[in-house]
Each structure stands twice: as C-alpha cells, then as structure tokens.
C-alpha cells in the first residue's frame, strides 16, 4: 500500500497478539505498549540522516557517525499517544515532545481539539506523530494539520493498529505524511472501533471505561 509501512518484526507481532487478548491486565497492556513502542521507533527512525564527527576513543581519534540536524520531535495525540512516548524516549532521550489534545466525539466520530503545546522550530525537525490507533483517522488528520500550521514540514505518523478506512482518509488529507503501523486490521464497526482490534487503547492502558 502506497505510503504505508507495516512493521512485521516477529517480536512486534507477538507482543501485539498479547495486547489484543481481552484478559491482558492494565499493567500488562501498559508494559507491552512501552516495549512495542521501542521496536516501532527503531523502524520509523531507520533512515535518519547521519553526519561524521571527530571523537577520541581510549585508543585513537576517529571519524564516527552521529545524527544530523536538530533533535527529533515526538508528537503525542492525547491521551493514548502518551503510551507510546515512554518506550520511544528511552530509545531517543534527547527528543523533544509535543502534545496535541484531540478526542473523538463518540456521536459524530469527528475530532475535537482541546490542547496544543509544541517545541519551537518545527520546520527544521522531523516530527513523528504517535497514536496507538488509526481508526476513522479524524483525530490524526486534525493533529497533523495543527502541526503543519505551526510550521512542521517533515512528518511521519506511527501507530499500533490501522483500519483501511482510516488509512484512506489520512492519505487523502495528508499524502505527504507516511504511515508506519504494526498491523492493518479488517474494518471499522458501526461505533468506529477497529475490528478485530484490541478495544479502546486509552481505556485499556489507564484502566478506565
């Protein structure tokens, strides 16, 4: 599928299966989300640009590769996106963090924005937007639009699960933003949930209903 990368690493697939199980506890779900987010982050940052730097090892001076340019920005779509942040920040502790408060109205399924806070110089940074679920795509579309309004030009979207409907909507709205996901499920049900899915990621992560 054009513009969509499915990360099919065996560890990702295994952990995702356990997360799908309805009997997986809140603590277990949260731990697995942290673990899988680290693996997903590894893949979404695979092609970051490098530059050479002169360093001194205990034995000699050498030219060695380091990341080029300004630090990354991880943009979390609240609240469930925060579940992906912890593992990603363990891998890239120097990353800046943006928070985009968007929730889906359960009656209209439309996105409602309520909060936005982001680092400066978004135009000079790679921004990786994170949300466990790409369902209708409305929240993600709105979040990316807000980031673009604030200057972001180089954006990637990372999620755990995606529905074909959400992918279609997102790609139509933001064809310049590639999607990275651990799996593409069958469809959305009448309530806008991904099927077979894993339920509401935020509720399962925080033990709420």
UniProtKB/Swiss-Prot annotation:
Allosterically activated by GTP. Uracil binds at residues 194, 199-201. Pfam families: UPRTase. 5-phospho-alpha-D-ribose 1-diphosphate binds at residues 79, 104, 131-139, 200. Its EC number is 2.4.2.9. Pathway: Pyrimidine metabolism; UMP biosynthesis via salvage pathway; UMP from uracil: step 1/1. InterPro entries: PRibTrfase_dom, PRTase-like, Upp_B, UPRTase/APRTase, Ura_phspho_trans. Its cofactor is Mg(2+). It comes from the Bacteria. GO terms for biological process: UMP salvage; uracil salvage. SUPFAM superfamilies: PRTase-like (SSF53271). Keywords: Allosteric enzyme, Glycosyltransferase, GTP-binding, Magnesium, Nucleotide-binding, Transferase. It is an enzyme of class 2 (transferase). It catalyses: UMP + diphosphate = 5-phospho-alpha-D-ribose 1-diphosphate + uracil. Binds 1 Mg(2+) ion per subunit. The magnesium is bound as Mg-PRPP. GO terms for molecular function: GTP binding; magnesium ion binding; uracil phosphoribosyltransferase activity. NCBIfam families: PRK00129.1, upp. Belongs to the UPRTase family. Catalyzes the conversion of uracil and 5-phospho-alpha-D-ribose 1-diphosphate (PRPP) to UMP and diphosphate. This is Uracil phosphoribosyltransferase.
